[in-house]
Amino acid sequence: MVRKIKSQYIALDKQNKVALGNAISCLKELADDSVDFIITDPPYNLGLFMKKRGTNMDKLRNGHFAASGWDDLNFEDWTKEMDKLFSECHRVLKEKGNLIMFMSIIKVETIIGLAEKHKFY
């Protein structure tokens, strides 16, 4: 299960605001084609690798991720959550809007596949 985070909105001026929180939850509150720019840093789902730097590499490469409390979904569940994120990003972004997503190099292939599915390429 993905950890629930309370959303916060910070007004930059009368027209622009920054949303801090679970990206999927925040995006669901927005209208279609209403966003110019999204920057998100979703869980990499690398578990203990992020804590111990360099441990469990064989398991990481085989899609078996260790638990770390906030980053412990199995690969299939993580992929479903990322699919939801891409779907919401595509829905709310304006035609010439931009998405920047931080992600581990280990997940690039999956991320590119989801981006293509949701017409970011």
Locations of the language-model features?
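S-adenosyl-L-methionine-dependent nucleic acid methyltransferase catalytic domains
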Residues: 1-121
